[in-house]
Amino acid sequence: VFHLVLADGSVEDVPMGVFEVSEANRLAKCLELKAYDFMLRFDRSFNGFETVGTAYDFIALCCKRCKVEFANKRAEIDAMPNGGVTLSVYTENDIETCRDVLFYVAQVLGGFFIINREGKLELRKYGKDPVMKVEQRHRFSSSFSDFITRYTAVSSTNKQTQIAEYYALDPDNGLTMNLGVNPLLQFGLKETREMLCRNILAELSVIRYVPFDSDTIGNPALD
């Protein structure tokens, strides 16, 4: 826990997370520890290739196998775009671990997974609303790009035909997110795959930011 002193003098207790020690080295004056969060637990082999279910079913299977609690509720995942669609793993795939499965499930849901401060697996979405303003006096250096990053198309490769299926907004004048060969996006009619990909695109299209590098005063309350 980090005890953060706020501007009004009050103290905010900021949990820094849950970690597992993987290596300990005793030095002359201290004990050096190397630790990782619970995401490392998902580097276990996945053998549920016969699984058929919704995104939540795949997540729950991985969490149970790797002994990590899932922070999101089933109703929350089912309500997301593509959350209620029945998925299955295409036979020819490059899935080796549960972490690979989570990567592809996150793609389908248009989000990403993290291990939160309570040590639970959590699905998050890309936001569009500012959460904090960092004043110039709090920045030691800054370097801003001269373009805006935004996505107006997605590309998903059909494993059977080896053809990249392209879906775009109108106008299509932004970046394209390449989904590669996602084993969960292979089955069903072309119309079904298009629906899944367009739902992913709808989630990605909210992303709009200017890439930058900056050295600032650290704030452990920010994720």
Label the model's feature ranges.
Residues 1, 100, 107-112, 141-223:
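An acidic/polar, Gly/Ser/Thr-rich interaction patch typically located in mid-to-C-terminal regions
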Residues 1-25, 53-65, 217-223:
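Short, acidic/charged, Gly/Pro-enriched secondary-structure junctions
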Residues 3, 34-36, 215:
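Residue-level recognition of well-ordered beta-strand positions that form the cores
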Residues 7-10, 42-44, 123, 129-133, ...:
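Short, surface-exposed beta-strand/loop "edge" segments at domain boundaries and coil↔beta transitions
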Residues 8-9, 82-83, 119, 162, ...:
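Intrinsic-disorder/low-complexity loop/linker signature
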Residues 14-20, 132-139, 164-165, 180:
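Short amphipathic beta-strand/extended segments with alternating polar/hydrophobic composition
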Residues 27-145:
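Charged- and aromatic-enriched interaction segments used to assemble
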